[in-house]
Structure formats: structure tokens, C-alpha cells
Amino acid sequence: MTYDSEFGSHISLYRDRIKQVIEDSLNEHPNSMILRVDLHDPIDTEEIDNPFFQPRVDSAAISRFTSALKAKLEHDKHIKTQRKDWPDTRHSTLRYAWVREYTKNGKRHYHLILCFNQDAYYHVGDYDLNRNTIRTMITTAWYSALGIPIDSSGKLVNYPPNGKYLLNRKRDNFEQTYSDLMNRVDYMTKVRTKIVGDGDRNFGCSR
């Protein structure tokens, strides 16, 4: 089934599944931080001369990304729980949804929402390879998934403007923030930038 918006036709199933991911996050983490993130493949793979660093742009890259990010979050939790002021209960279960899309030039990219416990992670932070900020962990997880060296720019990961949503059902602004988030979700569920029939999935989410 489909529905329509300013972006054209959309896939209803994708929207329903993404809503469930958000609900699951709120059920476990009443204070949830939801991020919109874009992951891009390298544009000019032929410029990477070292054969050991040829990008792994197969369909499993997105699964490697989520696995790498989970591992980084677990490692960050382990480090923080060594501190007396960081309770072990302040964990963050990663929940996510992604869609695969292609540009007019045939370049693959992914749009995602990533859900975190706001009590553990409130800020996205800077891209700093010396610190375990959310931005650093997300960006380096994608480079790891592609099997290429991490660079100082992190340019293959994009953080859209106003892409952070802080949700708590008890806050007065919950309905408006949730509505704004679902408008961003509509952009992810549009039909026109999806490729069907190539054997690879266009959608995936946490369970």
C-alpha cells in the first residue's frame, strides 16, 4: 500500500515499521534522542589505489555498519561504567531504520534514523577521532563497514540540519516534535528514488 504527500507516493509499510522502531525506543528509553543520518558510498572508488582498501560496497555494508555501531556503543558504555558517577543502568540500546536510495547518477546512499537513550547521549558532538562522541562513532562505523581508512573529514556521513529530535511523551512539545520527526520519515519512505527488482533490500530496521 502507498500514501501520498508533497514528496509524491510513499510506501506505507516502511512508515509503519519506522513508527514501531520509534515506539520501541520510547518504551525502553522514555527520553529518546532520534537522529537523521545519511550514509554515502565513496564517489570515486578508482582513486583508492591501495588494493587492501578497496571499498566494500556490497549489500551487506549496512548490516556491518549497524553491527560496528553497536560494538562502539558497548565499548563506550564499558569505559563510562568504570566511572563512579556513571550508573550501569544508563545504557543505550541502538534502534534504527534505513532505506536505500539512488541518485539520478546511480550513486547509492542510505537514509537512516538512529535511536539512542537521551540519558546516555544528549549531544551529537563534533567529529573528533580522539573522543567517543555520537558523531565520531557513527562516522567511523560507516568507514569500518566500507573497509576503508578513516579520514579527517568524515565526508561520507552527512548529518542533515535540524536532524536531532528529543522525545519524551511527558513533555509539552512531544506531539509537535513527533509530528516534525514523522515529516522527515516521509522523505525516507518515498517511492521515486527506490530501485526495485535488483535483488537487494530497500529497507531494514531493528527488531
State the predicted function of each range.
Residues 22-26, 84-87, 95-104:
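Catalytic micro-motifs at enzyme active sites that drive phosphoryl/nucleotidyl and oxygen chemistry
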Residues 45-93:
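Short N-terminal edge-element motif at the start of the domain
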Residues 38, 75-95, 148-166:
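Short glycine-rich, low-complexity/disordered patches
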Residues 32-48:
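Active-site-flanking beta-strand signature of metal-NTP-handling nucleotidyl enzymes
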Residues 2, 44-47, 107, 188:
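Intrinsically disordered, low-complexity Ser/Thr/Pro/Gly-rich regulatory segments
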Residues 1-29, 118-207:
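Catalytic "initiation/cleavage/transfer" segments centered on a nucleophilic residue
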Residues 95-121:
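Histidine-centered divalent-metal-coordination microenvironment in nucleic-acid enzymes
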Residues 8-23, 70-81, 92-97:
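A Trp-anchored, charged/polar loop motif used as the substrate-binding/catalytic surface
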